[in-house]
Regions:
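Long, charge-rich low-complexity segments
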Residues: 11, 92-94, 293-305
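Electropositive nucleic-acid engagement tracts
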Residues: 1-27, 89, 127, 275, ...
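Short amphipathic alpha-helical "interface-anchor" segments enriched in bulky aromatics
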Residues: 21, 208-240
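Charge-patterned, long linear interaction tracts outside catalytic cores
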Residues: 177-206, 220, 224
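Short, conserved catalytic/metal-binding motifs centered on acidic residues
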Residues: 11-25, 52, 99-108, 123, ...
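An internal, acidic/charged active-site-proximal segment
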Residues: 67-187, 273-280
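Active-site-proximal, Lys/Arg-enriched surface segment
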Residues: 1-59
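Basic, amphipathic alpha-helical segments enriched in Lys/Arg and hydrophobic/aromatic residues
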Residues: 235-290
Length: 305
């Protein structure tokens, strides 16, 4: 797959991780558990899945996944532990010069950040407010009491003729257990409250606030990937038996079908601008139908002759 796609011109590849739930109503499913998306939403039963993807240019390629088992199930592991296993097994493309790990606030644990640094990768992640500096002060106090006039207006253009504007503050700090990093406070409006301020952390050298925010916003590609996996290849929709191994294989089949779709129709992906797996699936179906019609016509002409 990676051999047929054109490499990134700058040699930079993003390793993006995110979790999702596929709702399941079965009460005897071995891997389904009760959960909710946030403190304000209701509970539901679903199959929790971690997905890791590579992103460069217009491409988004799923490379690994793990199912988060219920706490009462055997071989249970926390999502961060599963993510570290996938990080350990990850082999960068041969042309990749820089690997940047992008994730939300649920993944930057101490062991995870240390593993990223040990492997020589960089990270751009959102931090929880419970993290502390080397002087034992919390990020929450820092964000809450930072004066508003220190924020500066910044923007970038993810696509032509479309500008995204943010208010940001950047500083070099020393985090406990991690060391010196660059922290970026980002909010969409100047008068937003501290609760609406996003805390971003990176170990990229000489990174600007504009670059850090632009890299973190590319995490949206994994949301598009999850939507396409659920709608195009039926992620988690297969009805299988109670064996956990068969459930894992059913999820793997959805990712393999997505990879095959990109392999067959990668020429339909534009180098600039958005694209969708729905379009690739439609083009693939039309191509297969056209081949079948042409084959039938050739047989009829051969019989008539």
């Amino acid at each position: 797959m990676l051999q047929v796609l054109p490499p990134a011109q700058d040699g930079v590849v993003l390793l993006i991780v995110d979790g999702t739930y596929k709702e399941k109503t079965a009460k005897k499913h071995p891997l389904v558990k009760k959960a909710r998306l946030d403190a304000y939403s209701g509970y539901f039963r679903g199959l929790p899945i971690l997905i890791v993807m590579l992103q460069w240019g217009p491409y988004r390629i799923p490379i690994d996944f793990e199912i988060v088992r219920p706490k009462t199930a055997p071989h249970y592991q926390r999502p961060n532990a599963l993510f570290r296993q996938m990080l350990q097994a990850f082999v960068p493309p041969a042309w990749a010069q820089t690997v940047i790990v992008v994730a939300d606030a649920g993944f930057p644990a101490k062991d995870t950040l240390r593993l990223i640094q040990k492997r020589g990768f960089f990270f751009v992640m959102s931090l929880a407010r419970t993290w502390k500096f080397a002087d034992n002060h919390t990020l929450k106090n820092w964000v809450t009491h930072l004066p508003k006039h220190l924020y500066r207006k910044t923007w970038f253009t993810p696509v032509p003729q479309k500008r995204r504007i943010y208010w940001s503050y950047i500083d070099r700090k020393c985090l406990r257990h991690i060391g010196d990093v660059t922290l970026v406070l980002s909010k969409k409006r100047r008068n937003d409250s501290p609760k609406q301020t996003k805390i971003l952390v990176t170990n990229l050298p000489e990174a600007t606030a504009q670059q850090v925010i632009a890299l973190y916003t590319r995490r949206w590609d994994v949301e598009l990937l999850i939507k396409e996996l659920k709608s195009v290849t039926g992620l988690g929709q297969a009805q299988v038996t109670k064996h956990p191994e068969r459930v894992e294989r059913s999820v793997a089949l959805s990712l393999m079908a997505y990879l095959l779709l990109i392999r067959f129709r990668y020429r339909d992906i534009p180098l600039q601008g958005p694209w969708s797996a729905f379009t690739l699936k439609r083009n693939f179906a039309w191509h297969v139908a056209q081949q079948q019609i042409e084959h039938t016509v050739r047989l009829n002409l051969k019989k008539a002759a």
